[in-house]
Amino acid sequence: MIRIGILGDIGSGKSYVAKNFGYPVFNADVEVGKIYNKDRKIFNKLKKVLPEYIYTFPINKNEISDAILANNSNLRKIISIVHLEIRTKMNIFLKKNINKKIVILDIPLLLENKINKKNDILVFVQSKKKDITKKLKKRKNFNIKLYKKFKNIQLSLGYKKKKSQFIIKNNFTNKSVNESIKIILKDIL
């Protein structure tokens, strides 16, 4: 099984690129949403470490945001609890797709949390800053302070780009992305 990890800036189109490969995708953001909506065990753990912020089940994203914005250490607490569960879900996904030729890992903190393996193929999604900003501002509940907190815990884009074997320039058109994906797949298969 070939594992392709998708890297890039927040809002660069990583999930869009991941879907367009046409292979099974593990999308960590989607899984986090499921955890917040359905996993009472994680809710109880978060409530225990952040009782003044987390009190609603299903977990309210505004409560998570308030906790992160209130204190830098709260983000680390949330990550330590949620990412363990994400790693477990990813391992289940990988076992389920063991016979697939390729799987795509759409995990924002792939390198930061050392989830990638040595022989993973890393694809960096590069987008213009102005396009990213325009896209982010359209997102429901976009919060610039929250965005900056997440940026601060990520490795630099330059480092991620250097670690990647391939770069996809995403100008947010199907054509450019799909042509790049075809070239990558031809090269690795």
Language-model segments: residues:
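P-loop (Walker A) phosphate-binding loop of NTP-binding proteins
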Residues: 9
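Hydrophobic anchor at the beta1->P-loop junction of P-loop NTPases
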Residues: 4-6
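ATP-dependent small-molecule kinase phosphotransfer cores
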Residues: 33-99
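ATP-binding Walker
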Residues: 12
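ATP-dependent NMP and nucleoside kinases share a basic, alpha-helical "lid"
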Residues: 89-97, 102-139
